[in-house]
Structures are given as structure tokens and as C-alpha cells.
């Protein structure tokens, strides 16, 4: 390295240390999905960034979805995936696919990219995600809502400096498996662990005033402003439950929550190191 390159690198490290300080030896929960999960190159970048954070002393818990793989598996059975209000209708065949693809293939492919630092888990392990059938006007089948998060296994992994990689399947008191929304799982785990930050990766720039115009990105939202944005129709559709998970986490004592654009290279690092990415939710 030339002298000026060394100096530039040192300055970069110094700046990064300032932004990283609040998170060292703290827990960050990352909900991982969307385009950053489908694109193999971006997937590798995300895993590299998570490994880097682990090496820098940040305790990362990774919660992942796997919608495209599940839909592909359902189609191989000769069925069409069904969604109502953004939630997957999960019959017996579909929950079997969820267990095979989400808790199996998808989970282990992510663990493999973490080079010995990842440990693959699902909510059934040690009753981590105790749930019950989701009660709604529509019968979604084997879709659950969380009753309790048992953190013992997660705390054990984190204390060993490992990265828990969690697929979003829970279990009820009869041993029945349920599919659970990944944003909900990430938020509930973050609250149960007392995490400092919740990060949700999406396929969009963040919260937009005009959902067809990414230049209308809202970079920051104080949680007391959320209801007004819902009333204005700015927060609508699938963003309502996603943002509700963020506000629940913050109101439970979390420092901040980010909805970030997973299409941006190194999106997690950008959000932690003071860069502009997505929408930050916080409480005064």
C-alpha cells in the first residue's frame, strides 16, 4: 500500500469506528429477504458483511425468508401459491414445502456462506418460537402467530460468537409446525433479546411519499408520526405490518429500526456506518 492509501484506509476505519461503537457487543437482528436473497452475488455480499460485523464485535442474528423457493416447491406439486392480504395460504402440502425449503435448503445455503460462523436454526428447535394458529377472518391454514420467544438457544450461540441463522417456522404446544411472517419473527426476537437495532431488508428504497417515485424517499420517521402517515395513505398495504414491527420494537426499548434497500451493495454496512439507505425509525 502507498502512504496515501494507508492514510485513507486509516481515516475510513476511524470513521467506521465512530458509527460502530454503539453496536459493539450489542445485538442486531437482521431480517433478510427480497432481491438481495435471490441474487447470488448480492447474497454473498450480505453474508460477507455479516461476517465482518461479527469480526468487529457486533452480535448479529439473521432471520430469513424464502418466498420464491417456497413458491417454486409448491408449483412442483402442481399447485399455485395463494396469498391473501400479503400472507401465504399454507395448507398441509405447503407447510411441508416450507419445512423442506425454508428450514432446509435455504437455511443451510446461508449457513454455508458464513464460513463456519453460522449456526442454522428454525423456530421449532428448543421451542424457540412458540406459536398458535393465526386467528383471522380468513383461514390461512398453517400460519402462526408468536406466543413466546425462548431465547436460551440464541443466547448460547451468541455467547460462542456464532451467528444464528433462523428460518421462520414455529411450533404450538401440540407439536404442530406453522409458517410465520419473517418481519414479525425478526421483531419478536429482537424484543426478546433486547437488541439495539432491527434491520429489515426489502426490494424498495424505503418508505416513499409516492410509491411510484423513489426520489420521494422519507429518510427518517419518529414513531409518533407513523399513525399520521397511515392516515395520509403514505404507509399502506404491506408496509403497514412491516412498519408496525419496527414501531413495536422501538416502543419496547429498541434504539432504532431500519427498513433498507437490499438492492444496494453492502446495504447493512451503509445503514450502520452513517450512510443514506432506506428509512430510519426512532423515538425521541
Swiss-Prot record:
Disulfide bonds: none annotated. Keywords: Amino-acid biosynthesis, Arginine biosynthesis, ATP-binding, Cytoplasm, Kinase, Nucleotide-binding, Transferase. Gene3D superfamilies: Acetylglutamate kinase-like (3.40.1160.10). GO terms for molecular function: acetylglutamate kinase activity; ATP binding. It is found in: Cytoplasm. Pfam families: AA_kinase. InterPro entries: AceGlu_kinase-like_sf, AcgluKinase_fam, ArgB, Asp/Glu/Uridylate_kinase, Glu/AcGlu_kinase, NAGK-C. GO terms for biological process: arginine biosynthetic process via ornithine; L-arginine biosynthetic process. Catalyzes the ATP-dependent phosphorylation of N-acetyl-L-glutamate. The record marks 31, 242 as: Transition state stabilizer. PANTHER family: N-ACETYLGLUTAMATE SYNTHASE (PTHR23342), N-ACETYLGLUTAMATE SYNTHASE, MITOCHONDRIAL (PTHR23342:SF0). It comes from Actinobacillus pleuropneumoniae serotype 5b (strain L20). Belongs to the acetylglutamate kinase family. ArgB subfamily. It catalyses: N-acetyl-L-glutamate + ATP = N-acetyl-L-glutamyl 5-phosphate + ADP. Its main location: cytoplasm. Substrate binds at residues 66-67, 88, 179. Pathway: Amino-acid biosynthesis; L-arginine biosynthesis; N(2)-acetyl-L-ornithine from L-glutamate: step 2/4. The lineage of its organism: Bacteria, Pseudomonadati, Pseudomonadota, Gammaproteobacteria, Pasteurellales. This is Acetylglutamate kinase. GO terms for cellular component: cytoplasm. Its EC number is 2.7.2.8.
